[in-house]
């Protein structure tokens, strides 16, 4: 029997809906995912080899002392559903049993507990392996009970020993980390995301990256303070999309022009409406120039004055690009939860920067005909 020796960490990566695609599309998505893993690890000076297996990927970490960092980074790769540090062994039932016992013995040393229970869960993707999943579970479980004296608990075990039988070997593990799921970034086109220092827009950008888009983040600058916060947010999001682009447009003159013109006709309550219309017009120009396929905003229905359904209609009416609003139906608590999980919440809330141009009584139900009259009267977009 071979002794358990590990010189380099190996991580088995699992994907979800990629596996539902046709073979040509699946293979293309697997390759994009493979490259995205390598790019993110290289960003942190981690050398790795990524091999495509049967509906899974295997990541071999070549840089010592950065294995824990590599495990954290894989959490940020869109397309990964789960992953596990694994021990690889030959497709031989005796070798699998031997490796499993050694792995469990090693795992026990990390637990400060007298009575330890376990369960064995095998997935046999390689159907030519002569033992079924149930038979592997039984043989491995019996050996662990006999040699280590542990008790089986299939309902709530302290340790779950996982075994994946693939056509090139068996992969055994005791840890399973959750990924963010979705599709590999870059597989579904490019979007232009309006980004501010608030909670919502970074989450909207993340959700589009998770669905396979490359993102261009456009910040409409109104203050240096807000821009500095946005730069920190962009740095966080750049882990989720290693090809992320960031663009800054000086918006202060535009908003001041809007406010001045609306004041001249005593229609200051329409400030948010015309501000958002102008923002989308600027976004549309950048989207065309940068060859993006859609515009993304952090709008959440009913959250603020400009995000009522009536207002969203008049805000969007003169834009010829698709406008995607991934947060539109979420509760605020759901958005906050995602922001905390992806690492942008603390930055967004470190100091609230209120909009100095917000009117006392913003218009919540704007009529298209009224907006048209104002637009034509003071020459706004």
Swiss-Prot record:
The keyword Ligase does not apply. It catalyses: [ThiI sulfur-carrier protein]-S-sulfanyl-L-cysteine + a uridine in tRNA + 2 reduced [2Fe-2S]-[ferredoxin] + ATP + H(+) = [ThiI sulfur-carrier protein]-L-cysteine + a 4-thiouridine in tRNA + 2 oxidized [2Fe-2S]-[ferredoxin] + AMP + diphosphate; [ThiS sulfur-carrier protein]-C-terminal Gly-Gly-AMP + S-sulfanyl-L-cysteinyl-[cysteine desulfurase] + AH2 = [ThiS sulfur-carrier protein]-C-terminal-Gly-aminoethanethioate + L-cysteinyl-[cysteine desulfurase] + A + AMP + 2 H(+). ATP binds at residues 194-195, 276, 298, 307. Residues 68-176 form the THUMP domain. Its EC number is 2.8.1.4. The keyword Nucleotide-binding applies. Pfam families: ThiI, ThiI_fer, THUMP. SUPFAM superfamilies: Adenine nucleotide alpha hydrolases-like, THUMP domain-like. NCBIfam families: tRNA uracil 4-sulfurtransferase ThiI. PANTHER family: TRNA SULFURTRANSFERASE. This is Probable tRNA sulfurtransferase.
């Amino acid at each position: 029997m071979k002794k358990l020796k590990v010189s380099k960490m190996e991580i088995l990566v699992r994907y979800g809906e990629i596996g539902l695609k046709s073979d040509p599309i699946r293979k293309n998505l697997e390759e994009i995912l493979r490259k995205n893993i390598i790019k993110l690890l290289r960003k942190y000076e981690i050398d790795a080899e990524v091999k495509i297996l049967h509906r899974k990927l295997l990541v071999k970490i070549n840089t010592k002392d950065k294995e824990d960092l590599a495990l954290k980074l894989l959490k940020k790769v869109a397309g990964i559903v789960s992953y596990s540090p694994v021990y690889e062994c030959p497709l031989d039932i005796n070798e699998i049993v031997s490796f499993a016992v050694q792995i469990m013995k090693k795992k026990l040393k990390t637990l400060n507990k007298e009575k330890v229970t376990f369960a064995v869960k095998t997935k046999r993707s390689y159907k030519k392996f002569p033992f079924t999943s149930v038979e592997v579970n039984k043989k491995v479980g019996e050996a662990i009970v006999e040699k280590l004296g542990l008790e089986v608990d299939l309902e709530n075990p302290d340790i779950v020993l996982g075994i994946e039988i693939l056509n090139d070997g068996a992969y055994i593990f005791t840890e399973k980390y959750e990924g963010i799921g979705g599709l590999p970034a870059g597989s579904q086109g490019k979007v232009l995301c309006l980004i501010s220092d608030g909670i919502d827009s970074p989450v909207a950008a993340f959700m589009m990256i998770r669905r396979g888009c490359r993102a261009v983040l456009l910040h409409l600058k109104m203050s240096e303070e807000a821009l500095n916060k946005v730069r920190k947010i962009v740095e966080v999001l750049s882990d989720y999309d290693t090809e992320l682009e960031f663009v800054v447009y000086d918006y202060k003159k535009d908003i001041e022009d809007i406010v001045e013109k609306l004041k001249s006709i005593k229609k200051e309550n329409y400030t948010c409406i015309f501000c958002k219309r102008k923002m989308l017009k600027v976004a549309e120009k950048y989207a065309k120039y940068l060859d993006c396929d859609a515009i993304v905003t952090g709008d959440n229905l009913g959250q603020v004055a400009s995000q009522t359904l009536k207002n969203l209609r008049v805000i969007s009416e003169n834009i010829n690009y698709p406008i995607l609003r991934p947060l539109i139906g979420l509760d605020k608590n759901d958005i906050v939860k995602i922001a905390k999980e992806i690492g942008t919440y603390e930055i967004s809330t470190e100091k609230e920067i209120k909009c100095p141009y917000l009117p006392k009584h913003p218009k919540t139900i704007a009529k298209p005909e009224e907006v048209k009259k104002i637009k034509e009267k003071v020459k706004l977009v």
